Amino acid sequence: MLLLNATDRVALALLLERYGMQLALIAPREGIPGSYWGHSEAGLKGERLYARLDTPVHSVLHEASHNICMTPERRAGLDRDAGGTDLEESAVCYLQVLLADELPGVGRARLLCDMDAWGYSFRLGNTRAWFEGDATDARDWLCQHGVIDATGRVTGAKRSSA
């Protein structure tokens, strides 16, 4: 499992900044504000993403993707529980894979393996099979909301409407 301490945190902070988010590093063994799962999992409050050096990168990218994919109204009151529909959750998972390609030393292949190791569950049995063969609805959702373009590349834009 790739942890934040083994990644380029400057590149991650710059990626988050493109979306108007700030990365807040928390001291070792301290609780992570806004964490849905607790332990070392990333937390989200408004535009601030909280993590420790032992936070898995997939967790950071997942929470960032929640922020990007939610409506502005939900984003404004965000504290711990991102909410959203099942389709939005699929879009979040798809986007976190795309964002992994934006980070040196992370990449899609590594993130897909880490998502499987953590326990993400998809109909086709693993994250790669889902991403490559069963995620058209998630991709369409992201495109419809302007988060990715027609070629599947991230636009740097957040969802701006329902």
Where are these regions (language model features)?
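Active-site-flanking structural segment that lines cofactor/substrate pockets
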Residues: 44-47, 64
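Secondary-structure capping and boundary motifs in well-ordered enzyme cores
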Residues: 49-57, 84, 88
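Long, well-structured alpha-helical subdomains associated
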Residues: 103-162
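Active-site recognition of the HExxH zinc-binding catalytic motif
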Residues: 58-71
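Post-HEXXH active-site segment of zinc metalloproteases
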Residues: 34, 39, 68-98, 113
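Auxiliary, metal-adjacent structural segments of Zn-dependent hydrolase domains
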Residues: 1-43, 50-54, 98, 102-103
